[in-house]
């Protein structure tokens, strides 16, 4: 009986005794910042991982207008660039204009003699990149023909007129002699000459204007030669005309000579455009032009270039983000987010980074929570926080530097004859976009992985630094917490945080408390044995008491037991 009582008391003592006095020990936990609702990002190893903060890397909207600063933007209004270059009467205001970017509107139209340009896209690109319509007249001598032809389809004011940069030559009297004209280029720059050939709608119109039943135009330089024969025939009526003019162009290098030979149908040049090697360009857009500042322009409008990627438009001008297919790519600028649990383990509000993050930290990404004789508290660790921030801060700028284009992506145009070239160019362009889209996703995933790894590493560094300070004065409780075996007030906690903690000062006290606690602390395996032994003895005692009661009752006659055989 005495043995039973001793075992019961021992079992009660194991579970009720608190060997750690609140005044002689403390609990210190290390943790990191957390938010209630984080942001999902992609890493190399995870498609979705939650972080405390992230920055969007894809610009998906424009500001809806084109900024006229820092680039010189010229609004074409009702004129195309080619009409302005040819000298269409309603585009006279554009003579000698200059631009960085020429904006062509969908409302632009031609208002002169109907024409076509077999190599329209190339001529448009050359003139656009030159950045000016500066024109120099030259003294061509056209003997035996009538100059300055006019048309009722091309009116300047109330009078019949023609393209101001071209000279329509027709017969003089009843003759149209063969013309041979040369014009040397004695300058140190390339000259662009625009000329053409007239296609009458009928044979009668051909002989009426040029005498010969069929004319011919040959334009030559040392490097090239073009011979064009008019195609006589009726065409759909445009501005009252069934005839057409085909426009051609020739570039004459310094030291070269322009030679023109014709016996009819010639639309002659009046001079040349000075070729410039600028980074000017042209863009089709209906976005309004406004006074603002933006270094990147798209047909949708200007866009900020503070992000490395954009999916607003493939066509851009200026210093622009790289076009990709993705609508969103997020760069992690915070650590892995583990939202704080509402109910935690045996330490209540004191739980370390292994278990979860801490919400409400305002003085750092990493910090300490403690419980001692003076109560509980929390404080950030600025050094580890700053170390993580310094490594993350430069990420966005580095990604922008790697991806922003310092040039423009022009529109690609090809004639129907060049359909195969257009298909090939489109395939190449689409392949480039696919490649950049893949590279962008991979680059961001790598950066996100690095961010999460380095923020985790800073947490581990802080934990190891604290563990090395405390040494044998504390025990790692797991979960990012330490049990300190000596009295550690707020000043003591502060010394641990700032790295001035001297474990020798508290060594004796900690060892003494640790031995006292360990001396009476029973391991979980022995507790289980005691419980089972206690349970068995208790059951035995109950059986003995019950059997004794039955025997006593039988002796007194209170219980009767009949055994029948």
UniProtKB/Swiss-Prot annotation:
Keywords: Clathrin- and caveolin-independent endocytosis of virus by host, Clathrin-mediated endocytosis of virus by host, Disulfide bond, Fusion of virus membrane with host endosomal membrane, Fusion of virus membrane with host membrane, Glycoprotein, Hemagglutinin, Host cell membrane, Host membrane, Host-virus interaction, Lipoprotein, Membrane, Palmitate, Signal, Transmembrane, Transmembrane helix, Viral attachment to host cell, Viral envelope protein, Viral penetration into host cytoplasm, Virion, Virus endocytosis by host, Virus entry into host cell
Lipidation feature positions (S-palmitoyl cysteine): 554, 561, 564
Transmembrane segments: 530-550
Annotated site, Cleavage, chain positions: 344-345
Major site of localization recorded for this protein: virion
PTM per Swiss-Prot/TrEMBL: Palmitoylated. In natural infection, inactive HA is matured into HA1 and HA2 outside the cell by one or more trypsin-like, arginine-specific endoprotease secreted by the bronchial epithelial cells. One identified protease that may be involved in this process is secreted in lungs by club cells.
GO molecular function, one term: host cell surface receptor binding
Subcellular locations according to the entry: Virion membrane; Host apical cell membrane
Keyword Translocase tagged: no
Pfam family, one: Hemagglutinin
GO biological process assignments: clathrin-dependent endocytosis of virus by host cell; fusion of virus membrane with host endosome membrane; fusion of virus membrane with host plasma membrane; viral budding from plasma membrane; virion attachment to host cell
Extracellular compartment residues: 17-529
Quaternary structure, from the entry: Homotrimer of disulfide-linked HA1-HA2.
Assigned protein family: Belongs to the influenza viruses hemagglutinin family.
Function summary: Binds to sialic acid-containing receptors on the cell surface, bringing about the attachment of the virus particle to the cell. This attachment induces virion internalization of about two third of the virus particles through clathrin-dependent endocytosis and about one third through a clathrin- and caveolin-independent pathway. Plays a major role in the determination of host range restriction and virulence. Class I viral fusion protein. Binds to sialic acid-containing receptors on the cell surface, bringing about the attachment of the virus particle to the cell. This attachment induces virion internalization either through clathrin-dependent endocytosis or through clathrin- and caveolin-independent pathway. Plays a major role in the determination of host range restriction and virulence. Class I viral fusion protein. Responsible for penetration of the virus into the cell cytoplasm by mediating the fusion of the membrane of the endocytosed virus particle with the endosomal membrane.
Protein name per UniProt: Hemagglutinin
Organism: Influenza A virus (strain A/Equine/New Market/1976 H3N8)
Lineage: Viruses, Riboviria, Orthornavirae, Negarnaviricota, Polyploviricotina
């Amino acid at each position: 009986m005495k043995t039973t009582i001793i075992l019961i008391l021992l079992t009660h003592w194991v579970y009720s005794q608190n060997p750690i006095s609140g005044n002689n020990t403390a609990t210190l936990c290390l943790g990191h910042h957390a938010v209630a609702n984080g942001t999902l990002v992609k890493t190399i190893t995870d498609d979705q991982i939650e972080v405390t903060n992230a920055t969007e890397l894809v610009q998906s909207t424009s500001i809806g207008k084109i900024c006229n600063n820092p680039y010189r933007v010229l609004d074409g209004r009702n004129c195309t660039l080619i009409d302005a270059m040819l000298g269409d009467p309603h585009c006279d205001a554009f003579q000698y204009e200059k631009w960085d970017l020429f904006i062509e509107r969908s409302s632009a139209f031609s208002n002169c003699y109907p024409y076509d340009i077999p190599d329209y896209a190339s001529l448009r690109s050359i003139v656009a990149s030159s950045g000016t319509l500066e024109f120099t007249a030259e003294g061509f001598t056209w003997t035996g023909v009538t100059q300055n032809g006019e048309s009722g389809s091309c009116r300047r004011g109330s009078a019949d007129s023609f393209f101001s940069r071209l000279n329509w030559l027709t017969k003089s009297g009843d003759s149209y002699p063969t013309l041979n004209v040369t014009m040397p280029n004695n300058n140190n720059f390339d000259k662009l000459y625009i000329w053409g050939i007239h296609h009458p709608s009928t044979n009668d119109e051909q002989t009426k204007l040029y005498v010969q039943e069929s004319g011919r135009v040959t334009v030559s330089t040392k490097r090239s030669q073009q011979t064009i024969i008019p195609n006589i025939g009726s065409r759909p009526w445009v501005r009252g005309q069934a005839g057409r003019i085909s426009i051609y162009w020739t570039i004459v290098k310094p030291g070269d000579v322009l030679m023109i030979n014709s016996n009819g149908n010639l639309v002659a040049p009046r001079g040349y455009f000075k070729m410039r090697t600028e980074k000017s360009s042209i863009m089709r857009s209906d976005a309004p032009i406004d006074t603002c500042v933006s270094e990147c322009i798209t047909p949708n409008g200007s866009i900020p270039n503070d992000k490395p990627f954009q999916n607003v438009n493939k066509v851009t001008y200026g210093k622009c983000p790289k076009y990709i297919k993705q609508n969103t790519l997020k760069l992690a600028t915070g650590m892995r987010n583990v939202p704080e649990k509402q109910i935690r383990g045996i330490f209540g509000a004191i739980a370390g980074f292994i278990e979860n993050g801490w919400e409400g930290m305002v003085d750092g990404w990493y910090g300490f929570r403690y419980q001692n004789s003076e109560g509980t508290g929390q404080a950030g660790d600025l050094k580890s926080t700053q170390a993580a921030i310094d490594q993350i801060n430069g990420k966005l700028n580095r990604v922008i530097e790697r991806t922003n284009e310092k040039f423009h992506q022009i529109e690609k145009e090809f004639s129907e004859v060049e359909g195969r070239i257009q298909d090939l160019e489109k395939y190449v362009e689409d392949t480039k976009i696919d490649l950049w889209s893949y590279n962008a996703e991979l680059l961001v995933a790598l950066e996100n992985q690095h961010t999460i790894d380095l923020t985790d590493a800073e947490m581990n560094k802080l934990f190891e630094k604290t563990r090395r300070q405390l040494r044998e004065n504390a025990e790692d409780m797991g979960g990012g917490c330490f049990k300190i075996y000596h009295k550690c007030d707020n000043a003591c906690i502060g010394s641990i945080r700032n790295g001035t903690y001297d474990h020798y000062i508290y060594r004796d006290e900690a060892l003494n408390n640790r031995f006292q606690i360990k001396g009476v602390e029973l391991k979980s395996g022995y507790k289980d044995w005691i419980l089972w032994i206690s349970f068995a003895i208790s059951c035995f005692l109950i059986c003995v008491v019950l059997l004794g009661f039955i025997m006593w009752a039988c002796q007194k006659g209170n219980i009767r037991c009949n055994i029948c055989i």
